[in-house]
Amino acid sequence: MRRPPPLGPTTASGPEGNVRNLRKRQAPGPGAAGGCGPEAGGRGENRQKRRMVARATPGRGEVKSDKSVAASGAGKAARRRVEGRRGQVSPSDRRGLEAAKEAEFPLQTERHTKEKRKVTEASTDDPQPGFDLVRKESLTSSESFQTVECLRSLGKEGIVEGIKRRIRNKKLKSLENPPLKITENEATQNIKVEFQDELYKNTLKYSCNILSPEVENNFVFKLRDCNCFPHSKDCNDENNLPYEPDGGCMHVAENFSKKENFRSLAEKSDTNNIPQLLQTEENVMGVNKLLPEESDLYQSKINGLLPCLQREKNKYSIEESSVGRKPRKRMKLSEKADETVTQMNFSNEYNKSELMLQENQMIADGKEAEAKSPLNVLRKVSHNTVSLMDHLLSVPEMVEKETSSEHHVNAVFQKTIEPLLKEETENASEPLGYENMALKEDFKSKSCIGKSPEYHIERRSSREDLRSDSEELKLSCQRTIPMTGKRTWPYYSCARISAWCWKKASLPESSYFLPGSQKSCKKVDVPKHQTNKTHLTDSKLLLQSSLTETNTESSSKEKLDSNLNCLFSVSAVEHTLMVIKEPIIKDDKKIKSEELSRSGSEVISNTTEDTQLTSDTQSLTGNKKRDRGNLTKLNLTAASKDGQEANNSTGKTIHRKACVAKQTFVVPDLVKILNTGRLTNFKIPLLKNKTKKRKEVNAKSSEREAYSPLELLDNLSGADTRQNRSKENVSMTMLGPQTLSIQNSVTPVQASSDSFYNKNSCSISPSFTKHGNSSKPSNHFSEPGNIVSNKEVASLTVENNAFSSDPGYVEKSPSFCCNKQETFRPVSSEVRGRKITKNFSEVGFPDILKAYEDDVLLIDVIQDDPDLFGVSNEGELSFTSEVPRISQEPNVPGEHQLTDSKYVETPVKKEPSDDLRELPVLDCGPIKPDICASNSAASEIRHDPKDANTSLGEVANETSENETLGDFSEQIKGSDLDEKHRFTDKVITKEEKENIYEVRKSKDSRNADIMVGECQFAAPVPKPLCLLVPPLNLSGHQEDTILNTWMNDFRFLGKHSVLKLQNPETCEIFKREKNVGVFQKSLGLMIPYKYCKFHFNTLRGCERPLCKFAHVPEQGDEKVCMDVFKKYININELCLLQRAVNVFMEYYRKFPPGIYFDLQVLNDLLNSLLKHCLLKEVFQIVNLSIMVKMLPSLKILLNIFEHVATMKLRNAVPALIDIFCKLVEAGMVLDPEHFNYIVKLLYQVQASKQEITAVLEMKSRLQMRQFKKNWKCDLDSALNKLEHCKEKGDWTKLGKLYINVKMGCEKFADFQTFCACIAETLTKNCEDERPDTPFCEFAETVSKDPQNSKVDKGVLGRIGISAMYFYHKLLQWSKGRKVLDKLYELKIHFASLKGLIGPEKLASRCQIVNVAAEIFLKSGSLDGALWVMRESEWIIDTPLWPCDRLDVLNRHNLLCTIAHETLAKSLYRQTFEVLQNLPGFQNSQETVEVSQYSLLFNKLLGSCIESNSLGMSSSVAEFMISKSIPIDFSFLRRLITSLGRSRLWLKARAHYKSALSLGCYPPLEGNLYRKLLLIPSYLSEIEMLLAIEIFMVSNASSIQSPGTSTQILQIVLKRCEDNQSRSNDDYQAAVERLIMAARISDPKLFVKHMTVNVNKEQVYSLEHCSALKWLKENMKWAGKVWLFSNH
């Protein structure tokens, strides 16, 4: 159970009490440490501490010497006992260790004093007064903590309590300026003091904890086989630490508790934490010196201590889970902010403050942890385990709690880490005094962390706790108005900036998790971490202003945390989220809600876990910018935990001064870490309803909870502290394996930068990573250029953070990457770093603090204000792009595996018009679970998708996230080096030499463009810098990580840009853009409605995935094309020119050039493309123009050659030569000098001999063509050649002569004359008996010409007609037939042509066809004659082709001849076709009498009937009847009978009816209605049946009426007059046919014989029933057939 805090003013709750206590603490005096004996040392002690630090930094030897000096007497003996024995430490041993502790404590005190002085000096440099106060406070608190720890080591609990009170008072005094923070800090300090007391008791119980609190702080021990020991706040818990076989490997004896306590403290009060952190840093520095010796002692006892520690840890975790939720809630916002501030400050004062902060924070955390529930403490513990820095911070408290066990563990870690720490300390000490201490701690943390990769199990539990806490936060966390007492802004107020800082401690306690636990916790805490990250970012914003003061302390603490986190921040993404949530554990619900709200506003999601960490770090360094709210935009905090951890550690080194100076703190490792994290596109949320949205955000959305920069200014004291805490938490989370590596990697970027930068900058040597838990850190950031530079980096830069991550740093510290940074995606960070760096370089944010000092009026506007920025969906562009979602939700290990030891490169495609503000930030995305933390981070991301999905705010207009996303996977595969070089080249080569980023004002003064040096970031100016981060080197585990690209818009108040998304929300964003006015102005084109106005009439073009309007002009709209081309050419924008190319290609591939085609437009377009070096597009257009026979000018061709030669585009030469040859072949004429110039250019490009030879061949060919042209144009010479060919009968040569003349003759008249001469030549002298035909040989030669065209066919056809007439005249049918066959072979349709000479030149078409048909007939080719007729379409005389009567007569005779021949061959169809086309049938105007054709048709009809061709017979009969051609009735009756017998009743009835109309049968009208039918006996049975049908239908009414059944229907078989000569047999046969007719009817009819009339004619009666039945079945069709006429 935790001890109740001592009563007194120091413990007074509420802001007043805290303020009073802070004021007391701030009271000046030599006993700034609170009057504690050891701490009361004057400057002499500080000097001694400095000297000791200097000794510790040079190397292990010095450290060991310091340790030996420090450890004297019983202390040494105790250590020996401990080292000699690894079993359970006995009480005596513990006492010995404590004695050693006491011996070492003075050294620690001195160290603290030195660090205090350093801090004080640094603060004096700061332009803002708040810094000095904070630093003093931190020193005081650190001294008091040291005193308390000394007393604890002595076992004087009572004295410790008194000291605690003093410390509280001092802290309260020091924190007087920020009343709210002071109150929170005071409470936190009280808790810390109490917790320290308890820890001290525990320490007494566990005497094995010999190391001083400082030493313990520095120790983080990770055992793969051991579980992480969460240290409960209560001493009893620590004593009863149970062993947890969770597999948590990290055993941080006191680091865990300290972390927990520190976080709790940070959550409660940033200010208190800061002083404590400073003290802790000092203590830690002292501890670093003592570590080597103590580590030896601890190593001997590790085995025994681990089980104890594990038990205690388990126990503490259990107790923490059950204890102190309410206190934690009380401290939610303030503590979180404090932790963030502390972390930032910690990173600023990384070395000095780090130690002091560690002790202070650990003490404060211990207290806070006591106040908080054990669960929170446990979470913190796990987080502490995660981040070595956090462990170090938590060591003091841990010392008290898990005194002996944790000390042993710490000792072991220290031993392991000592060498690393020494190296790191040396590296750090060189650049910065603070760095030495911080590096030591980092190394210690690293080694410890590296030892316990299995810790993730416990982290998982802690994450779960964090989740629960975050859930609580979600429920309870609302955007609270700062407690500073200064002006507050309502949620809807325009004064509240979009980048609202999280008032609650945004840092999750997850940062306290051990790496192993972090992994497990990541899954659970991802949402929280994300939220916390967002909080961190916001808090950083708030903190940045106040952090400038508190930043030193908090940054020191953060440094430790971040260093530790760096180790774990390999899984930094998850860690970061965890960190954010750690402070939330206290106010878990609030924090979670805050996280959610923040992540909403900042668009920080699970993906942004790392970004949040980065943002925290950045906010630490760039608190001012963060305060602006831009920090919130950055969201880089979560982007890369690892980077942030590194950054945090660095940032911790960074002092307030640096923050105040706004100098960008260059932390390459931090940048890497930032890159590792998934940076959601941090965009200022646009809220439809400011009030509503703000409330939602504040109350429960937990997606975004931001504080206005104004509030930040007001709340700097309080909110900054919270932010520092949250940042510290973040850094703790980042403290994973990455933290250590980060510190090593980090090197001072720019000493020239403000002191803030120098302080903040921490050099991290590659060895640091190596010394870290494993080589994994190096794997992650093994590449020096690897920096978490994506959104995270951007966030840092934007924040004005001293963290202008320097690629150089990262490069310097390839080992920066923690082993577990596998989770962290350096590749993505690299990629992001580059692109983000570019974007960030363009982004600039006003510094609130600086503006305040300069008396500048800063107007804070909520970017979600619809009045100002339009209404966006859900108050902001929900950045739910596929990539962010992937990074958040699908943070599956598999995704992380995409990048195999390759640098993930996420290019952010930015159009030239992108404002510098518009910064696309790449989200590192979830890191592969290879790092336990990364795995959990992925789960966490998945768990808290809405944070990731929360709107990014505004995205750069020009930035195309889709592109970024599309290329993301490939870039991940890409190498960091490539991207790094690419990025560096793009940014500025000058900066490569300088190795710094130069800040240049962008279009918007708020935007700063940072130049990338050789992987280094420099912050030369206090202006807000955008971190350009070179691509991170994704090594080892990072290979598996996948980066998710995010677009981050860090614009402060600029125009809103729209991020192109590849998801269904694109349309909504499109609408938003439209509302906001993001679209560019119309280009002024008059585009028809059916075409997309965005595609044609805007610079950006159409962004709709499915546009209902056309993007390519349709046929007939060539004028639109030309107008578009002209406009685009005038504007001369690259994107428009490319669009013009697409339109040109799409249109002219489908449609040929029309009347609106302008060759000058084509030439201008090609020139514009050449100017923009779009050679590929030029080739495409030229090739297409050749196809459509629209050749560009010769000047364009020469310009293309010049461009290729100038640009040395050797690869383009083959394609260019091909185009050149095509142009020459198409008719382009070049002079010899042009050829010589082209050859010269080709030599410059070093073209091959073959290519140059091809050009020379074209030259010779063109010259020959010109020579032939001159010769061909000589008509006289051509005619002479013609005569020569005629004389020799060389018709083949004549054909070649024709081809040459055709190619060279310019005048068509001359060509016609020449062709007429050829026709005459071919027809003369052909009277001989030679079988050959000159025309055929000539036509064969001409037809073989490859350039043979329709003109040639026309000429050959006309010459052939002349030859045909010639042979027809001579009756040489065979030769004429050959001519016609050749024309048929060549598919020359001569029927539509006329001859060239003679009468055929004026012949009608009918005549030409007649001649040809006659030739075929005379030659015996009936098919040829029919072919000629069909080809001529049987045309005789038409208005278009008139002819004379002789031609018609000739045609009639010809067709009759053909008909007789075909009919003789039984070709009935061909005969009928010929007869149908006889003159008189085609044209009604023809005066030919068609009745004359009766014989022909009847002959054909008879032939068809005889051959039983019923179909043809029926067609002929119908045609004859229709044309009124007399028909033979006998043929017609035969046809009807044949059709009936063939059951073709329809045609039989039709023809019978026609026959009746023609008079073929006697009329029936008179007899039908008398119920009497007269049937001639000569009719066939078919004809009789048809007559009966007509009879029944005519009398149907009488037959069907009732009562008429008695009526009789009589049928008389009439004898014909002319049949009298016929015998009775014929009549009897007629009777039988009648009976048969009745039978074949369907249904059958019954005819009954009645009598014989006077004429001896048989009379029959038709039975009524049968007739009635037939009518019922057939009346429907019978009525139509017989009662109605067909015409």
Swiss-Prot record:
The keyword Secreted belongs to this UniProt entry's keyword annotation: no
Recorded GO CC terms: cytosol
InterPro entries attached to this UniProt entry: TOPAZ1, TOPAZ1_dom
Domain of life: Eukaryota
Annotated Polar residues bias: 598-622, 948-963
Ranges of compositional bias, category Gly residues: 31-41
GO biological process: cell differentiation; spermatocyte division
Location in or out of the cell: Cytoplasm, Cytosol
Keywords, ordered alphabetically: Cytoplasm, Differentiation, Spermatogenesis
Protein name (Swiss-Prot/TrEMBL): Protein TOPAZ1
Source species: Macaca mulatta
